[in-house]
Structure formats: structure tokens, C-alpha cells
UniProtKB/Swiss-Prot annotation:
UniProt keyword Iron, yes or no: no
Taxonomic superkingdom: Bacteria
Gene Ontology molecular function: ribosome binding
Phylogenetic lineage: Bacteria, Bacillati, Bacillota, Bacilli, Lactobacillales
Annotated SUPFAM superfamilies: PRC-barrel domain, Translation proteins
Residues in PRC barrel domain copies: 96-168
Protein name in UniProt: Ribosome maturation factor RimM
Length: 172
């Protein structure tokens, strides 16, 4: 089965079995909602077990979650440093114009049919996502995911067409 990374357990939270998660999920509110099914992977990326979320809340930059049948710090302390993943089957459907991060990362980025580079990472600094584009012989390009910049995303062909606004590329 194929799994996709959605977060890392960085610490426990209190004594009642809550965990502090650093999310890398594209849809954290959906991914960590009550009843969601996730998989735990250890620090060597080996599958450990399936888990069900029974509670979720945000606290600063972390998602605080609790798993079914794990209601005390002693039951969860061993999971610090483990990764949470979602199976492909549990990802859910997307609206038109929405994409999973794993679909975008690795895509070729073009401006006027000239290859700029490939998306290597997606950041979530605030109002919109920022795609980090790795370029040959240049510094990475930070590309805001907004309509005037990202013109077309072709998932089947792994291609993104963009129009770089003035000031986006400081190496030109």
C-alpha cells in the first residue's frame, strides 16, 4: 500500500495521551479530524500500526491530536519522533483546482515553454502556499501559488506553467 507523509510526532502534550504534531499535510484540518485513519511509521520508516484520531486541536504551530485507545502519556511516549502517514485510499477526493503536495513536488516548471526548474518543496507561510523551485546553477525560486503567477497545473504530464511577475526572480 502507498502512504504519504502528513506529520511528525515531536512530543507529548500533558498526561492524557495527547501528542504534539508538526504537520506537513496539505489539508491538516481534514487530515487530523476526529475519525480519521492514519498510519504510524517509526524512525526507520517502518510501518508500526494503523491509528484513529479521537480529538484534534491547534496550538500555535502544532496540531494536538489523540489516538483511540491511547489515553495516557505512558501509552504514547514511545511514539515521539514517529511519522504519521495517510494511505492513498484514505486521502479523499479533491475539488477542481486542488492538489495533494505529493502530486506537485517534482513537477517541471515552465515559463513560456522554457524550463525553469522543478518543485522541490511546498511552504505554508500564511495566506497562500509558496512552491520552492530548484533551478540549475541558480538559487531556489520562491513561487507564490496565486492565479497571476501559476497559470496551469497539468498533473498527468507533471508540468506547471507560470508567468513570473516582476521582482519574483532576483537573479534576472
Amino acid at each position: 500500500m502507498e502512504y504519504f507523509n502528513v506529520g511528525k510526532i515531536v512530543n507529548t502534550q500533558g498526561l492524557q495521551g495527547e501528542m504534539r504534531v508538526l504537520s506537513v499535510s496539505d489539508f491538516a484540518e481534514e487530515r487530523f479530524k476526529k475519525g480519521s485513519q492514519l498510519a504510524l511509521f517509526d524512525d526507520k520508516d517502518r510501518f508500526v500500526q494503523e491509528v484513529t484520531i479521537v480529538s484534534h486541536r491547534k496550538q500555535k504551530h502544532f496540531d494536538i491530536i489523540k489516538f483511540k485507545d491511547m489515553y495516557h502519556i505512558n501509552a504514547i511516549e514511545k511514539y515521539k519522533g514517529y511519522t504519521l502517514k495517510v494511505s492513498k485510499d484514505n486521502q479523499g477526493d479533491l475539488q477542481e483546482g486542488e492538489f495533494y503536495y505529493h502530486q506537485i513536488i517534482g513537477m517541471a516548471v515552465y515559463e513560456k515553454d522554457v524550463l525553469i526548474g522543478h518543485v522541490k518543496e511546498i511552504l505554508q507561510p500564511g495566506a497562500n502556499d509558496v512552491w520552492v523551485v530548484k533551478r540549475q546553477g541558480k538559487r531556489d525560486l520562491l513561487l507564490p501559488y496565486i492565479p497571476p503567477v501559476v497559470l496551469n497545473v497539468d498533473v498527468p504530464n507533471k508540468r506547471v506553467d507560470v508567468e513570473l511577475m516582476e521582482g519574483l526572480d532576483d537573479e534576472d
